[in-house]
Amino acid sequence: MLSALIYFAVIGVVFFIFGRVMPKDRIDPRAFPFRLYAFEKDGAVYRSLLVHRWQNHVPDMSRILPHMMPEKKLGTHFDLQTVQVLLEENCTAELIHWLLCVAGLFCLKLCPGMGGVVLYALYFLGNLPYIIIQRYNRPKLIRLQERLQQREVRKGACVCVF
């Protein structure tokens, strides 16, 4: 079991670094796997899980390592570029947590039997809230981005769209 716990720690660090250095220019929040699906009802399904009440109470790497992560709150002054960065970070966070869930399956080799199954289930359930939070916030960020793009078009500025 100790080897599985060490493995979880190692892949956590490796995937964190990967998430920081991976190119973000190919991330499209409107395309698979990040796009919104019909069952999500534009994020309403996550609101029914009360994500808006608990999302700020889970540990967040942007608060733990603020010098390595972009701020995840918009504040009162923001622009299209800020929202774009937040969308990229949102998709990256979801991707990393899904990759952690998949890579975590290796713990079943390190800790065979029911102990490994329970350990993996806990690991998966530990990553699931972060995936849900990203999927809850993405529709709001996309709507905000679209409003800002429309504002830029009305101003006559050049707008870059995915």
Question: Which residues are covered by each model-predicted region?
Answer:
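N-terminal signal-anchor transmembrane alpha helix
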Residues: 2-31, 35-44
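Hydrophobic core segments of alpha-helical transmembrane domains in multi-pass membrane proteins
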Residues: 7-12, 107, 116-127
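Hydrophobic alpha-helical transmembrane segments of multi-pass integral membrane proteins
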Residues: 10-14, 66, 70, 94-104
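Alpha-helical transmembrane segments of multipass membrane proteins
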Residues: 11-15, 19, 100, 126, ...
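Inner-leaflet juxtamembrane helices
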Residues: 19-33, 130-145
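Membrane-proximal soluble regions of multi-pass membrane proteins
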Residues: 26-86, 143, 147-162
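Transmembrane alpha-helical segments and their cytosolic interface motifs
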Residues: 83-115
